[in-house]
């Protein structure tokens, strides 16, 4: 007990020392990012190496009989197989094979461990939702959205937002995945996303939930938010993201935010692609681990990069506020640590302020403000995320 307490105190003292210094922000370019020895940044090197080995060992794979004929890394096959139980499950956006398990551990802004192919641009699935909520946050900060509790419909010139059911839906509800938005986008009806297995018409029969009454993870509704944001900015969302977030944090030019083959819309007489909020039907954000780490470092500093505020602190406060119907979820895609809550995605007593951006695969950007820590982990089994985080935090001396 005493040894554990002393170790915790030492970690807190080092974290305090790190915060007392001017925060380090890497210059553009993967090679320009300064590396530091793990021990000098408060890690037990052997324990950190073991945590990294754990992440590599627990790569997401198919059952052996399927892995033998179609490796899980071939996302052009594994993604359609994952969603084959859904009606309207066919991909309509790009898919590509992924790389090997990869990741980065960053403390105090410095890289202390990296593995795999962190420079490789891969699908990131639902972490795309985190990028989307950042862009919606920019619209709110700019005053283009007056209040997140405003109804979305008056901002959008699209009849699907003006039905009796959808008209009262608010921005806040869409961001928290409690909107219950009902309709069809790009050939995908909302009822066809994640129905009960063996009962493909279950959501169609049940009908839409009342707006704000239930949390439902639904990519059609996420895509509706992306379309609404496009109507607000009246410019392609990837352009906004690049100018306002990714270029200022020094991200590479290699990331791509895809829409679908059929998601072109006309705004002010110009044809634009409405991007997707994930890779469910293909598309979404394709990005490297290094660039994901820059997003994580921006999150660690609550929207500030090297003295420049890119996104308001108020937006991060809202993003990190638990929702009424999903206490482990803030705005998309902020998964919140819930110490003491059974069944929580993360239940970490010594990192109460921790949160993560999560996508299928699993892709994870884990952020612990208490430890001045960002971890990017790609292609780890979903059931092993929490165990990896436990090992990582235990490696802090």
Where in this protein do the model-derived segments appear?
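Active-site SXXK
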Residues: 44, 109, 123-148, 174, ...
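Catalytic-site signature segments of enzymes, centered on catalytic residues
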Residues: 110-120, 183-262, 283
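Active-site helix/loop module of the DD-peptidase/beta-lactamase fold
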Residues: 142-181, 233-281
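N-terminal leader/targeting segments and the immediately adjacent pre-domain N-terminus
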Residues: 18-117, 142-145, 231, 395-397
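Active-site-proximal loop and beta-strand segments within enzyme catalytic domains
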Residues: 34, 56, 63-95, 124, ...
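Active-site-proximal alpha-helical segments within enzyme catalytic domains
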Residues: 130, 134, 221-228, 283-304, ...
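Active-site Gly/Thr loop motif
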Residues: 263-279, 283, 321-374
């Amino acid at each position: 007990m005493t040894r554990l307490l002393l170790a915790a105190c030492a970690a807190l003292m080092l974290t305090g020392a790190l915060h007392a210094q001017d925060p380090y922000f890497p210059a553009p370019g993967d090679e320009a990012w300064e590396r530091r020895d793990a021990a000098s940044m408060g890690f037990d090197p052997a324990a950190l190496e073991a945590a990294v080995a754990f992440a590599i060992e627990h790569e997401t794979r198919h059952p052996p009989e399927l892995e033998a004929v179609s490796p899980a890394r071939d996302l052009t096959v594994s993604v359609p197989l994952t969603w084959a139980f859904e009606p309207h499950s066919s991909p309509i956006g790009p898919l590509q094979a992924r790389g090997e398990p990869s990741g980065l551990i960053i403390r105090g802004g410095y890289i202390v461990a990296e593995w795999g192919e962190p420079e490789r641009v891969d699908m990131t699935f639902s972490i795309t939702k985190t990028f989307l909520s950042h862009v919606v946050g920019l619209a709110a900060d700019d005053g283009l959205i007056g209040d997140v509790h405003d109804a979305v419909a008056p901002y959008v010139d699209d009849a699907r937002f003006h039905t009796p059911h959808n008209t009262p839906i608010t921005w806040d509800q869409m961001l928290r995945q409690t909107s219950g938005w009902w309709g069809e986008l790009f050939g995908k009806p909302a009822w066809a996303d994640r129905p009960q297995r063996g009962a493909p018409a279950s959501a169609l029969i049940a009908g839409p939930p009342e707006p704000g009454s239930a949390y439902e993870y639904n990519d059609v509704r996420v895509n509706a938010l992306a379309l609404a944001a496009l109507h607000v900015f009246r410019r392609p969302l990837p352009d906004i993201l690049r100018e306002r977030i990714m270029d200022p944090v020094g991200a590479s030019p290699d990331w791509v935010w895809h829409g679908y083959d059929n998601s072109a819309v006309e705004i002010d007489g110009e044809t634009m692609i409405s991007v997707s909020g994930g890779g469910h039907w293909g598309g979404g954000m394709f990005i490297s681990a290094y660039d994901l780490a820059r997003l994580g470092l921006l999150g660690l500093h609550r929207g500030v990069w090297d003295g420049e505020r890119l996104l308001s602190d108020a937006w991060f406060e809202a993003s990190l506020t638990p929702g009424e119907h999903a206490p482990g979820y803030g705005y998309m895609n902020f998964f919140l640590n819930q110490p003491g809550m059974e069944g929580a995605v993360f239940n970490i007593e010594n990192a109460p302020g921790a949160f993560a951006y999560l996508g299928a695969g699993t892709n994870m950007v884990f952020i612990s403000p208490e430890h001045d820590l960002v971890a990017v982990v790609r292609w780890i089994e979903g059931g092993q995320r929490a165990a990896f985080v436990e090992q990582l935090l235990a490696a802090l001396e």
